[in-house]
């Protein structure tokens, strides 16, 4: 999940934060002319849905930066957002850890990173599963290498 479970509200459910990473903005070549983040006003944007924590964080970030962006669409799937972005010459957002996959596609370029807007990852499990070996392994694994910044 992209947010923790409040166990006082969701009885019997628990969550453990397993990592977080910043987000990057991507587009197909050629990149916008203005520097980041002003370039976000040059093309329409594809963002995570407002129901997601990341979608809400991004809307707040746009506002705090004084950016007047045009949102073309909201998506719950990063791969679909990337495909739609390529088809409509739009800028799209994805967690920076996706960079390894996106760099393989030479038609897609990273135009900027925001390290103070974080995508969070939480493992959610039922109380009855807390002693299950798989849940224990997920909760006790060090994921820091997975969430380290991608090299540009």
Name each region found by the language model:
Residues 13-20, 105-118:
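Short beta-strand->loop
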Residues 1-8, 74-75:
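Central regulatory/effector-binding core of bacterial HTH transcription factors
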Residues 51, 56-109:
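Hydrophobic hinge/microswitch elements
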Residues 42-65, 131-133, 139, 148-151:
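Secondary-structure junction motif
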Residues 1-4, 29, 95-98, 114:
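Short secondary-structure boundary segments
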Residues 10-50, 133:
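Flexible hinge/capping segments at coil-to-helix
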């Amino acid at each position: 999940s992209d947010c923790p479970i409040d166990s006082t509200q969701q009885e019997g459910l628990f969550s453990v934060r397993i990592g977080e990473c910043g987000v990057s903005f991507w587009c197909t070549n050629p990149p916008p002319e203005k520097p980041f983040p002003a370039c976000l006003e040059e093309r329409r944007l594809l963002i995570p849905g407002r129901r997601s924590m990341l979608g809400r964080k991004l809307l707040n970030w746009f506002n705090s930066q004084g950016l007047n962006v045009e949102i073309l669409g909201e998506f719950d799937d990063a791969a679909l957002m990337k495909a739609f972005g390529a088809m409509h010459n739009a800028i799209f957002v994805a967690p920076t850890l996706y960079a390894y996959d996106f760099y393989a596609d030479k038609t897609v370029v990273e135009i900027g990173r925001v390290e103070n807007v974080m995508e969070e990852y939480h493992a959610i499990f039922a109380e009855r599963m807390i002693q299950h070996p798989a849940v224990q392994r997920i909760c006790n694994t060090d994921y820091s290498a997975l969430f380290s910044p991608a090299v540009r």
